[in-house]
Amino acid sequence: MGYTSPLEDTKFVLENLLPAHEDLDDTTIDAVLSEAGKLADNYLAPLNHFGDKNNPILRQDHEVETPEGFSHAFSEIAKGGWIGVASDSDYDGMGLPVRMSAAINEYWHGANMSFALCSLLTQGLIDAFTLVGTEEEKKTYLPKFNSGAWTGTMNLTEPQSGTDLATIKTKAEHDGENWRIKGQKIYITYGEHDMLSLIHISEPTRLAII
C-alpha cells in the first residue's frame, strides 16, 4: 500500500513556524528529511501490508523470525544511524534536535507503525539513559542503541493489568547487591531480545515497581 511522506509540510513547519535552532539550517533539514522520506516511502510502506498478512514466526529454538524484508529494512535504518538521530554525537548519535527525530518518526509510523515501533522504543531507552544514566552506563549502552545492535522493548501488560500501571504487581527488591525481580509480563512489544532495560519507581522500603 502506498505512502508518501509529507516533506513539504514538515519543512514548512520546521523552517517557518518553529523557533530557529543554531545547529539546524534549511539545507540540513532538506537533506535529512528527504532521505528519511525515501526510507519511509520505498522500504517501510511496501512492507506494511505484507507484514499484516505474514505474521512473525516463533521457531523451535525460540528465535523469532520477522516477516520477509523487515530485517533488511531495519539494517538500512541502523546503518544510516537513523535510530540515534537526536542522540548525543559523543555516543555515536547524529546529535540533531529532537524536532528532527519527531518528524522522521511521523514518516516512519505513517508508513509502517508495526515496524517503526522497534526504533521508537529504542529511542525511549536512549532518552532514559541520557537523562539518568551514569557516564559508564552511557558509554556502555548508548552506542549499542544508536547503532541498532541492541533494541528496546515495552513491558507493561500483566495477566491482570493492561496499560493501567496502578494495578501491576511485578516488583523488584534490592538485596543489598542486586535487584531481584518477581512477577510476570505478557504481550511484550518487540520482546524477543536479550537486553532489557527496567524502569522502576523506588519506594521507601527499597521496593520497586517494574
Question: Where in this protein do the model-derived segments appear?
Answer:
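Short, glycine-/Ser/Thr-/acidic-enriched flexible segments
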Residues: 82, 89-92, 134-135, 157-161, ...
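Short acidic, glycine/serine/threonine-rich loops at helix termini
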Residues: 95-100, 127-133, 163-168, 191-194
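Core alpha/beta catalytic barrel or barrel-like domain that forms the active/cofactor pocket
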Residues: 84-89, 111-126, 148-158
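Single conserved hydrophobic/aromatic residue that forms the stacking wall/gate
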Residues: 199-210
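Internal maturation/activation junctions in enzymes
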Residues: 56-59, 121-122, 133-170, 184
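Short, well-ordered loop/turn and helix-capping segments at boundaries between secondary-structure elements
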Residues: 19-20, 110, 127-135, 147, ...
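Amphipathic, small/basic residue-rich leader segments at the start of a protein or domain
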Residues: 1-116, 140
